[in-house]
């Protein structure tokens, strides 16, 4: 019998949304994605102790300044975890820029170059790395610069059509439109508390973005992210990529239910519209209260987890 996971792999690149190396070995995804929250949870696992020690030693050798040591240790730990994952996945690892830089184009570019340099020094070429950046206007501009330097980017915390359009117009390699967090917002802020998968507002958002990209011939990869249940995943079967947490990969592997393709644009390709200006971007994005709330909340949450990671690392410096 074909499992749903195998069926999904036949139409969509399956990516593991985890920093847990054992889970990645088990489900054999093409790529893996990490973020500050996943790095924080992974760093608590005993098998990662040596990676933390290596990051601490690296930071101490680079600088005597405590603040700089903390920054260097964080960056090195994220890359160390990425390097371990790259021993298992045949494709790419996504490593995230510090969320506290989300509104600073120059600082985001500088941090991305540093992360790439650490990977390159470990013998990993750019074509196996995606730099994750929050989909703010400033982050999108940073990604535009990085893409021209041959550094491919994964634009995350993407909730609005305006964000998706601006990313495509900037020539970004890949976007991660969120599904589950959109559902969370609608459940919390409207009277409707239950959704069937094809009416799930997160599913509708990603479907709309996917069709828009195909309709206008944008090459940017659409990788649905942040899932709350397998119904959301099966409704997006056929999406370019889906990044899925281990618990949901397990559910897909244990199911033999039929999995028809849902996303498959067959229409004509139209001429691309003129790119959004900064003011148009903000107008359109800010007209979506869900997107405004979830982008800001996502940046705050990642920043808080970075600070927790720093607190742990600082005890070792």
UniProtKB/Swiss-Prot annotation:
The gene is tal. Pathway: Carbohydrate degradation; pentose phosphate pathway; D-glyceraldehyde 3-phosphate and beta-D-fructose 6-phosphate from D-ribose 5-phosphate and D-xylulose 5-phosphate (non-oxidative stage): step 2/3. One of its GO terms (cellular component) is cytosol. InterPro entries: Aldolase_TIM (IPR013785), TAL/FSA (IPR001585), Transaldolase_1 (IPR004730), Transaldolase_AS (IPR018225). Its main location: cytoplasm. It comes from the Bacteria. This is Transaldolase. Transaldolase is important for the balance of metabolites in the pentose-phosphate pathway. One of its GO terms (molecular function) is transaldolase activity. Homodimer. Keywords: Cytoplasm, Pentose shunt, Schiff base, Transferase. CDD domains: Transaldolase_TalAB. It is found in: Cytoplasm. It catalyses: D-sedoheptulose 7-phosphate + D-glyceraldehyde 3-phosphate = D-erythrose 4-phosphate + beta-D-fructose 6-phosphate. Its EC number is 2.2.1.2. Belongs to the transaldolase family. Type 1 subfamily. The keyword Cytoplasm applies.
